[in-house]
């Protein structure tokens, strides 16, 4: 059996919304960032020269497309990423103190 990847991760891939300042009316401004521990680890390993792949599911929506493009841009193989029209990509709102 031939090994194609050094590391393959299975798990969550989502959008983290984090505060990035305040509006003129004092409301928090939110920034959308790719998140999910499995792909964070894969991105680091990819930068260290490892060949990586991800298995998971996102919605067939703008956020899901953005996440696919993001992991592909850093070299993570996305053949195992399912884009499902019947679900929405997970959004996490991160509150910092």
Annotate each language-model stretch with its function:
Residues 22-25, 68-70:
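Short, glycine/charged-enriched secondary-structure capping and boundary segments
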Residues 51-97:
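Conserved N-terminal subdomain of the carbohydrate kinase-like
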Residues 33, 40-51, 94-96:
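Alpha-helix C-terminal capping segments
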Residues 25-35:
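Short pre-catalytic strand/loop immediately N-terminal to key active-site residues, enriched for Gly-Thr
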Residues 1-24:
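Positively charged, low-complexity intrinsically disordered leader regions
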Residues 5, 10, 33-40:
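Short secondary-structure boundary/capping elements
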């Amino acid at each position: 059996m031939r090994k194609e990847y050094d590391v393959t991760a299975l798990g969550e891939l989502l959008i983290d919304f984090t505060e990035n300042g305040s509006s003129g009316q004092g409301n928090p401004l939110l920034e959308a960032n790719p998140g999910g521990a499995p792909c964070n680890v894969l991105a680091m390993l990819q930068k260290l020269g490892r060949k990586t792949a991800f298995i998971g599911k996102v919605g067939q929506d703008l956020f899901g497309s953005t996440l696919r493009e993001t992991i592909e841009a850093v070299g993570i193989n996305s053949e195992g990423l399912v884009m499902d029209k019947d679900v929405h990509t997970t959004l996490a709102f991160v509150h910092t103190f």
